[in-house]
Amino acid sequence: MLSSPPLSLTPPQSTRPGWPRWVVLLVAMALAGCAGLPKEVDRPVSFALAAPVDTPLGQLVAARRAAEGARHASGFALLSGPQAAYSSRLALVDAAQKTLDLQYYAIHADASSERLLLSVMAAAQRGVRVRVLLDDFHSTGRDAQVMRLAFVPNIEMRMFNPVTGARASFLGRMWGAVSDFSRVQQRMHNKLFLAD
């Protein structure tokens, strides 16, 4: 009578050791984390418009200030909801003649952002100086479409990132976040949209 080997509930042991994969992964993360910050590049200093009253938007704000019983001394206004906010941004881009200053935490790749970016590029093409300050956290993958602004004449693009490491490398970003966790939440959540 032939006997069969006893049944075992333990999984078969792998003949390949698993540690080389971990070593390769750790070395790759360490090398990506060594990238550090990019070298200094020439960034021209730019300033706000000296005489905003010379533009139609500036004249509108000046008229609002002079109005009898005006409660505000600026063009600041609260908006009622997302549709009003979006259409107001598009109107500001279309009305801008001299400058646009945009500060965002994230510009996601969607239809509304695409329309806004096309309007901003059209403003730059008609001679409006555009300055964009964007948090670097949401500027990869599909959302990297916003980076094309950096190559348009009259657009100055700056990125904010408190975490060191390679921007283009996922491993570099992860290593930077893990090795300096205290800075991960120091994001630029401010949002600003100024015209003329």
Annotate the PLM regions.
Residues 2-32:
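Sec-dependent bacterial lipoprotein signal peptides
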Residues 14, 40-46, 58, 140, ...:
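A generic signature of intrinsically disordered, low-complexity regions enriched in glycine/proline
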Residues 30-51:
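Bacterial Sec signal peptide processing site at the extreme N-terminus
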Residues 34, 51, 57-58, 64-96, ...:
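HKD-type phospholipase D/PLD-like phosphodiesterase module
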Residues 100:
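Phosphate/adenylate-binding glycine loop and adjacent helical scaffold
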